[in-house]
């Protein structure tokens, strides 16, 4: 029987409770789930890539499925090329709303055409739908407490950023 290998990618800047929920739920469908932190040249990151890897790995230690999850980073390649190299059997994507669906439908088409790799979509839980990293960064920039929406270790790192600015 072929090993089921998933790949869930994003910038995770910062990691949210919504991301962790998708990782936990998706990992139950795979023998191995790679979580890829990829550099996006169109975004100005709050945290460097290595710090985001470190924060995600720390947050995963509290999940019961962490033995199935491996964090990877990549700075310069198409996600589908990484997926092929890893032997991925399905991409994992999260849908919060209709805007996500429109974007992901387009990506699904190209991923499938280029590699034959299917995409599994996970709907965000209703209470996590509003969460996204951009909103967390905005709220944090205006001095708002975002600890309810991010893992504790991420909240701690955000506070450290605040201290460095003083």
Swiss-Prot record:
> Required co-factor?
Mg(2+)
What InterPro entries would the database entry show?
A: Cyt_trans-like (IPR004821), PPAT (IPR001980), Rossmann-like_a/b/a_fold (IPR014729)
The top EC class, named as a word, is transferase
The molecular function terms of the Gene Ontology recorded here are: ATP binding; pantetheine-phosphate adenylyltransferase activity
Describe which pathway this protein belongs to, using the record's wording: Cofactor biosynthesis; coenzyme A biosynthesis; CoA from (R)-pantothenate: step 4/5
Principal place where this protein is found?
A: cytoplasm
The subcellular localization recorded is:
Cytoplasm
Which GO BP terms apply?
coenzyme A biosynthetic process
Intrachain S-S bonds? none
Keyword field: ATP-binding, Coenzyme A biosynthesis, Cytoplasm, Magnesium, Nucleotide-binding, Nucleotidyltransferase, Transferase
Site keyed Transition state stabilizer: positions: 19
Gene3D superfamilies, per this entry?
A: HUPs
Record EC number: 2.7.7.3
Swiss-Prot/TrEMBL catalytic activity: (R)-4'-phosphopantetheine + ATP + H(+) = 3'-dephospho-CoA + diphosphate
Asked whether the keyword Isomerase is assigned, the reply is: no
Specify which residues bind substrate according to the UniProt entry for this protein.
11, 43, 79, 93
Binding positions for ATP per the UniProt entry: 11-12, 19, 104, 128-134
Which family, according to the similarity comment? Belongs to the bacterial CoaD family.
So what does this one do?
A: Reversibly transfers an adenylyl group from ATP to 4'-phosphopantetheine, yielding dephospho-CoA (dPCoA) and pyrophosphate.
Q: Which HAMAP family match?
A: PPAT_bact (MF_00151)
Q: How does it assemble?
A: Homohexamer.
Which protein are we looking at?
Answer: Phosphopantetheine adenylyltransferase
Native organism is Lactococcus lactis subsp. cremoris (strain MG1363)
């Amino acid at each position: 029987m072929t090993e089921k290998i998933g790949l869930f990618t994003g910038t995770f800047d910062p990691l949210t409770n919504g991301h962790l929920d998708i990782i936990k739920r998706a990992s139950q469908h795979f023998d191995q789930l790679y979580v890829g932190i990829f550099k996006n040249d169109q975004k100005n990151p709050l945290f460097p890539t290595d710090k985001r890897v470190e924060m995600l790995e720390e947050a995963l230690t509290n999940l019961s499925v962490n033995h199935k999850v491996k964090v990877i980073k990549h700075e310069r390649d198409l996600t589908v090329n990484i997926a092929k190299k890893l032997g991925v059997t399905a991409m994992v994507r999260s849908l919060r709303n209709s805007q996500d669906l429109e974007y992901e439908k387009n990506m699904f088409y190209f991923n499938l055409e280029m590699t034959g790799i299917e995409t599994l979509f996970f709907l965000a839980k209703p209470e996590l739908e509003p969460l996204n990293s951009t909103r967390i960064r905005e709220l944090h920039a205006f001095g708002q407490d975002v600890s309810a929406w991010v893992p504790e270790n991420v909240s701690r790192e955000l506070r450290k950023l605040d201290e460095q600015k003083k």
